[in-house]
Amino acid sequence: MEFILSLIGSLLLIICVLVSVAFLTLLERKVLGYIQIRKGPNKVGLMGIPQPFCDAIKLFTKEQTYPLLSNYLSYYISPIFSLFLSLFVWMCMPFFVKLYSFNLGGLFFLCCTSLGVYTVMVAGWSSNSNYALLGGLRAVAQTISYEVSLALIGFKILLFSLL
């Protein structure tokens, strides 16, 4: 029973994160509209509030294209896996309600963010294009260099908080 409740809590957390991202993109579009002295997205519904959901429907109904010589399965699985990894990062965030309580939350965060590097590399490799592979390898090198500095800063904060 406790497992089912934690699973429901996790699903609610992920749904809330995805809905908040949708409305933050709506806010971004509205602010950009006001900055450029034009109205933002206001054609759908009341003040454009259903606009993110209409955008999601539009994206899911678009025609799926893929490179002719690509590895089809890994080409489509790698972005999905990257999305799931970014959603798993939210599981280690501390909340008032104990969703998942484990002592190594910082290490879990670093592991999930570092696994996201492999999805970029697999996406570049599976397209069977030299340019996409080079772009993927450049993104991997850049992400790894940023993760090293992020881990060092995090460990420094942890070390100084214990003193």
UniProtKB/Swiss-Prot annotation:
| Annotated compartments | Mitochondrion inner membrane
Instruction: Specify whether Membrane is a keyword of the entry.
Output: yes
Catalysed reaction, written as an equation: a ubiquinone + NADH + 5 H(+)(in) = a ubiquinol + NAD(+) + 4 H(+)(out)
Write out the transmembrane intervals: 3-23, 77-97, 104-124, 143-163
Taxonomically, which superkingdom?
Eukaryota
> Which keywords does this Swiss-Prot/TrEMBL entry list?
Electron transport, Membrane, Mitochondrion, Mitochondrion inner membrane, NAD, Respiratory chain, Translocase, Transmembrane, Transmembrane helix, Transport, Ubiquinone
Q: How does it sit in the membrane?
A: Multi-pass membrane protein
Under Pfam families, the record lists: NADHdh
Single Gene Ontology MF annotation: NADH dehydrogenase (ubiquinone) activity
- EC number(s) per entry: 7.1.1.2
Per UniProt, the enzyme's principal EC class comes to: translocase
Q: Name one GO cellular component term.
A: mitochondrial inner membrane
Coiled-coil annotated spans: none
Question: InterPro entries this protein is in?
Answer: NADH_UbQ_OxRdtase_su1/FPO (IPR001694), NADH_UbQ_OxRdtase_su1_CS (IPR018086)
Q: PROSITE patterns annotated for this entry?
A: COMPLEX1_ND1_1
Q: Which GO annotations describe the biological process of this protein?
A: aerobic respiration
Entry function: Core subunit of the mitochondrial membrane respiratory chain NADH dehydrogenase (Complex I) that is believed to belong to the minimal assembly required for catalysis. Complex I functions in the transfer of electrons from NADH to the respiratory chain. The immediate electron acceptor for the enzyme is believed to be ubiquinone.
Similarity comment: family membership: Belongs to the complex I subunit 1 family.
Name assigned to this protein = NADH-ubiquinone oxidoreductase chain 1
Organism equals: Drosophila madeirensis (Fruit fly)
